[in-house]
């Protein structure tokens, strides 16, 4: 940590203003139709957005609506729960910077007010009672009561919540642990399994790569959100075993044939893998 706060100057302030304006608009307090819509001709369903580009109808609840997941796939419901937790966390951190570095209590208050609205929306809409796992976090909701139970490997994800915003969701939180058990099982429609060299492999995938591939990022996040060093090291060992001899982490791979992978070198996952190695062995 350098303690260098010189980056929080005019560019930072202007950028934050634009982000706040966008967040406010996408709370959709005046209805589903905002200035943003996205529609294009494509042979891939998740590359465009329904309802002439406006997406599934939403009911204003304080959360921020979005059209696409971190995977770049279009959402089914407009309120992506992991992204809203992350937004709340970042807004609270931005408020600290504004107050301590920029000496702007007014803008800090604005960030905190928006964070509070998101938090209220999450508390009222983010959880449902699963018949097998108890109370869990939904992946997406619409504010009307509809919800989607799944997780995608890309972060922000439900699995990654304690990694991205530990001040909001603890690893030991009961709802998170219930959710973790659900999404790291075949009760998550995007959890896939296979067997490679006698080892059964199961991990979370993504609609982005179809129905037969798991993502190293999900295995990494499993390790990064674990307090068990043995589990962390098991994740490292599995990732090393399934790199297809390339020495790199990939976007996704077939759990029964790691040589069948996408992206020969995926910087995002390679960086996270290094962090997991430090967490598992650096101590």
Predicted region positions:
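C-terminal capping/lid segments that line or modulate ligand- or cofactor-binding pockets
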Residues: 148-170, 174, 210-283
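Extended ligand-binding clefts on enzyme/binding-domain cores
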Residues: 20-88, 100-101, 108-215
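Intrinsically disordered, low-complexity activation-like regions
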Residues: 93-96
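Secondary-structure boundary/capping signal
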Residues: 6, 31, 130, 231-232, ...
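Aromatic-rich carbohydrate-recognition surfaces in CAZymes
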Residues: 1-48, 266-282
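Structural helix-adjacent loops and short alpha-helical linkers that scaffold large soluble proteins
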Residues: 2-17, 98-113, 165-180, 224-237, ...
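Alpha-helix N-cap/helix-initiation motif
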Residues: 8, 76, 80, 262-266
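Enriched - but not universal
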Residues: 15, 187, 194, 218, ...
């Amino acid at each position: 940590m350098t303690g260098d706060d010189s980056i929080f100057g005019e560019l930072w302030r202007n950028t934050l203003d634009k982000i706040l304006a966008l967040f406010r608009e996408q709370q959709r307090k005046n209805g589903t139709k905002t200035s943003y819509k996205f529609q294009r001709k494509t042979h891939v369903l998740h590359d465009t957005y329904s309802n002439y580009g406006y997406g599934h109808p939403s009911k204003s609840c304080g959360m921020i609506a979005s059209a696409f997941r971190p995977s770049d796939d279009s959402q089914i419901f407009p309120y992506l729960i992991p992204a809203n937790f992350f937004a709340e966390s970042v807004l609270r951190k931005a408020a600290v910077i504004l107050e301590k570095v920029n000496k702007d209590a007014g803008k800090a208050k604005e960030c905190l007010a928006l964070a509070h609205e998101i938090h209220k929306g999450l508390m009222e809409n983010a959880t449902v009672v699963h018949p097998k796992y108890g109370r869990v976090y939904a992946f997406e909701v619409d504010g009307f009561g509809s919800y989607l139970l799944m997780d995608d490997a890309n972060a922000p994800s439900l699995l990654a919540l304690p990694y991205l915003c530990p001040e909001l969701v603890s690893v030991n939180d009961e709802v998170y642990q219930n959710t973790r058990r659900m999404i790291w099982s075949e009760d998550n429609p995007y959890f896939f399994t296979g067997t490679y060299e006698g080892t059964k492999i199961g991990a979370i995938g993504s609609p982005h790569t179809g129905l037969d591939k798991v993502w190293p990022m999900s295995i990494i996040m499993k390790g990064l959100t674990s307090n068990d060093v043995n589990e962390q090291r098991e994740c490292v060992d599995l990732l090393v075993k399934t790199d297809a001899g390339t020495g790199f982490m990939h976007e996704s791979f077939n759990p029964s044939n790691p040589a069948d992978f996408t992206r020969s070198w995926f910087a995002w996952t390679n960086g996270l893998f290094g962090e997991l190695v430090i967490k598992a062995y650096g101590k």
